[in-house]
From Swiss-Prot:
Functional description taken from the UniProt entry: Essential for recycling GMP and indirectly, cGMP.
Ranges where the Guanylate kinase-like domain occurs: 6-192
Protein name: Guanylate kinase
InterPro entries for this protein: GK/Ca_channel_bsu, Guanylate_kin-like_dom, Guanylate_kinase, Guanylate_kinase_CS, P-loop_NTPase
Organism encoding this protein: Pseudomonas syringae pv. tomato (strain ATCC BAA-871 / DC3000)
SUPFAM superfamilies noted in UniProt: P-loop containing nucleoside triphosphate hydrolases
Domain of life, source organism: Bacteria
Gene Ontology MF annotations: ATP binding; guanylate kinase activity
């Protein structure tokens, strides 16, 4: 039987653009009966020194560790990429990522542009997607509606968002989240199209191709 390796998808977005909600909706959609055996997308769980927010679960949303443990993991070469954002450290486990891909699962990696650069250097075959808000005003409103941050933090996030968005042209695909349902369909289309590339189809249907051309 042909071994099929999964595809790594890097997804980046400024805080408040809707990345987390879109990825969750994508994961929920693949559980629908019509997707059947094609339901093989996984989401990478990053390590972070950030404090856990209400409703988050350790090992599900993030692997929460203290700074000393994170630094130890860096020294041991455990991370494929790591970055510091708003004073918090984030990193992706190299061994878990490779194991998931080797098992044939597509893997979503939600990281910022700094981490994306690091990953693309080591894994140039990864697909990359950038999610944009429809406007700065809409982004500010979304951050305010969260009710999680002070005005000062929101201003800092807006400044960071502009910096983050300036790197959109480093990505293969861009999704503008002006309508959630439409943005979700755009995201699904990227995954569907990638599964139809010649390379992917050759991996999946190698025996069929040999038979057809015999």
């Amino acid at each position: 039987m042909t071994h099929i390796t999964g595809t790594l998808y890097i997804i980046s977005a400024p805080s408040g653009a809707g990345k987390t909600s879109l990825v969750k909706a994508l994961m929920d959609a693949q559980q629908e009966p019509q997707h059947g055996a094609q339901a093989k997308i996984r989401v990478s769980v990053s390590h972070t020194t950030r404090a856990m927010r209400p409703g988050e679960v350790d090992g599900v949303n993030y692997n929460f560790v203290d700074r000393a443990e994170f630094v130890r993991m860096i020294e041991h070469g455990d991370f494929l990429e790591q970055a510091e954002v708003f004073g918090n450290l984030y990193g992706t486990s190299q061994s878990h990522l490779q194991q998931t891909l080797d098992e044939g699962h597509d893997l979503i990696l939600e990281i910022d542009w700094q981490g994306a650069r690091q990953v693309r250097t080591q894994m140039p075959q990864a697909r990359s997607i950038f999610i944009l808000p429809p406007s700065q005003q809409a982004l500010r409103q979304r951050l305010t509606n969260r009710g999680q941050d002070s005005d000062e933090i929101i201003e800092a996030r807006m400044r960071e968002a502009v910096s983050e968005m300036s790197h959109y042209n480093e990505y293969e695909y861009v999704v503008v989240n002006d309508d959630f349902a439409g943005a979700l369909e755009d995201l699904k289309s990227i995954f569907r199209a990638n599964r139809l590339t010649q390379q992917h189809q050759q991996e999946q249907y190698s025996e069929l191709f040999q038979e057809l051309l015999a």
